[in-house]
Swiss-Prot record:
It comes from the Eukaryota. Its main location: membrane. Expressed in the eyes (at protein level). Expressed in the eyes, the pineal gland and in the brain. This is Rhodopsin kinase grk7-b. GO terms for biological process: regulation of signal transduction; signal transduction; visual perception. InterPro entries: AGC-kinase_C, GPCR_kinase, Kinase-like_dom_sf, Prot_kinase_dom, Protein_kinase_ATP_BS, RGS, RGS_sf, RGS_subdomain_2. GO terms for cellular component: cytoplasm; membrane. The gene is grk7b. Residues 447-512 form the AGC-kinase C-terminal domain.
Length: 548
């Protein structure tokens, strides 16, 4: 008898992997009917769009691109200002010889009075300091006074002129296009990657860009039955707030008749728990552990900078992308605690919860550092500090161990730096715990990590997933849900669904448009305009690519 479950899994994996290799001809076909809305239809957006410089010229990718295009054709002075900021950023991130080369290039290009790119907009005092800059005071002068003067200059007349230019018109058209309604027809859907308490996660692909994402589908009836609406909305709100290389990004939020859908960064390399127990020997190599922990630390610090406590730090919630870089995921238990606020709510996963959570004492961000200590320990030893892998422990005993037992470092792969950082993260006194009052990035464990370069995405990972491997459980191993019966929706439910389904998330969506080439294509003034919108059903790919 043939193994139909194995065949279904093979076909699902094949379609999923095939979709990640873009077919340029197919993409072109899907884009044929796309076009930016005419300016006459963008009046509402022009009135409502933000007029803040940081928002539309720095934070929004398409806004930044349009402003840069304006600067490049307006005047040499405007272009020089933009190029200086770019090159200062490159200098700041460069290392060794490349850093010195970048410094000399900046001096020759921008700091000499006879240079075509000399910064003529500087005041007399600023210009004199710029011309006299040396290796000794380069950072102080160029990254301080000159950089600030350049940013101030761009916020002035160049920004005013930009807002009356054709380039700003183009930005407004994109902001209108950004407001298109999003439904499940915007995507192709692929295999199920996993399931949680309220639904499943599957792979999806945007039809017009080919971009792959993970779609978290929350069952509406299950949410209502388990009173999970507030938690789902909070997770969505937090995902919209964060913008970090080390946290999954939310790109779209929409609903279907049966599900609320969060479309996020696809992390096709699997989670760290999978790598600990199912890839090679139990545990992870120390070089990888250091790299992942550095990225996790940066992600946690990003959350904490916005007064967000993660509360579910564990290897299972740390996902790898196709290049081997990691991000935090599943922010369903995260909580916002502004203005020094604390909570005593019990939340987290057994084996990773800090003493203050278990004792239901007031806490804030300290609990995430405890959980990170447990996670580093597990990456090394294949178990958490106070519970063996798959050991069944009564909650009273686990509480006793967490509050009383000393951490033992018996595994051969523990070294002095890993023992020390774990011990500091697992201090039971919050004030003594690493991360509570100091920066964990300064610990010796991270001596090989250049954090500015890491946070700019410039450090290659020590391990890269294989392109032909699906790092997820077989579809047959993913548990099924029982039916939810007797749940009916009312007006309040419909209001909640509408509040949840806000369509695209601007920064992530704009970056997708740029990365896929669609921004350049639709912004081309020589391109024949057509009605903006999605493909007709007849234009969609005829062959089936949905297999769940």
């Amino acid at each position: 008898m043939s193994d139909m479950g194995g065949l279904k899994n093979l076909v699902a994996n094949t379609d999923y992997l095939k979709a990640q290799s873009l077919d340029e001809k197919e993409i072109k076909k899907r884009r044929c009917s796309l076009g930016l809305p005419h300016l006459g239809n963008c009046t509402d957006v022009r009135v409502s769009v933000s007029k803040g410089f940081e928002d539309i010229c720095e934070q929004q990718p398409i806004g930044r691109a349009c402003f840069r295009q304006f600067l490049s054709v307006s005047s040499p002075e405007y272009l020089a200002a933009a190029e200086l900021l770019d090159e200062l950023n490159c200098w700041n991130l460069a290392e060794a010889e490349a850093k010195e080369e970048a410094r000399l290039n900046i001096i020759n290009k921008f700091c000499k009075a006879d240079s075509k790119s000399f910064l003529a907009f500087l005041t007399e005092d600023e210009a004199e300091k710029c011309k006299a800059v040396s290796e000794k005071d380069f950072e102080e002068v160029m990254m301080g006074q000159v950089k600030e003067a350049t940013q101030k200059f761009l916020r002035g007349q160049p920004f005013e002129e930009y807002q009356t230019s054709l380039f700003f018109d183009r930005f407004v058209q994109w902001k209108k296009f950004e407001k298109q309604p999003i439904t499940d027809k915007y995507f192709y859907e692929f295999r199920t990657l996993g399931k949680g308490g309220f639904g499943e996660v599957c792979g999806v692909q945007v039809k017009t860009t080919g971009q792959m994402y993970a779609c978290k589908k929350l069952d509406k009836k299950r949410l209502k039955k388990k009173s999970g609406e507030k938690m789902a909305l909070l997770e969505k709100k937090i995902l919209e707030m964060v913008n970090s290389l080390f946290i999954v990004n939310l790109a779209y939020a929409f609903d279907t008749k049966t599900h609320l859908c969060l479309v996020m960064t696809l992390m096709s390399g699997g989670d760290l728990k999978y790598h600990i127990f199912h890839v090679g020997e139990v545990g992870i190599e120390m070089e990888r552990i250091i790299h992942y922990t550095a990225q996790i630390t940066s992600g946690i610090l990003h959350l904490h900078s916005m007064d967000i406590v993660y509360r579910d730090m564990k290897p299972e919630n740390v996902l790898l992308d196709c290049q081997g870089q990691c991000r935090l995921s599943d922010l369903g238990l995260a909580v916002e605690l502004p203005n020094g606020k604390t909570t005593t709510q019990k939340a987290g996963t057994k084996g990773y919860m800090a003493p203050e959570i278990l004792k239901q004492e007031p806490y804030r961000t300290s609990v995430d550092w405890w959980a990170l200590g447990c996670s580093i320990y597990e990456m090394v030893a294949g178990r958490v500090p106070f519970r063996d892998h798959k050991e069944k422990v009564a909650k009273e005993e686990l509480l006793r161990r967490t509050l009383e037992d000393e951490v033992k470092f018996e595994h051969r792969n523990f070294d002095a730096p890993s023992k020390d950082i774990i011990s500091l993260f697992l201090k039971r006194n919050i004030e003594d715990r690493l991360g509570s009052n100091d920066d964990p990035r300064k610990h010796e464990f991270f001596k090989s990590i250049n954090f500015p370069r890491l946070e700019a995405g410039l450090i290659p990972p020590p391990w890269e997933p294989k392109a032909n491997v699906v790092y997820a459980k077989d579809t047959g191993d993913i548990r099924e849900f029982s039916d939810v019966k007797g749940v009916k929706f009312d007006a309040n439910d419909e209001k909640f669904f509408k509040e949840f389904s806000t369509g695209v998330v601007p920064i992530a969506w704009q970056q997708e448009m740029i990365d896929s080439g669609l921004f350049d294509e639709l912004s081309d003034p020589n391109r024949k305009e057509s009605a903006a919108g999605l493909e007709d059903e007849e234009q969609q790919k005829s062959k089936s690519c949905t297999l769940l």
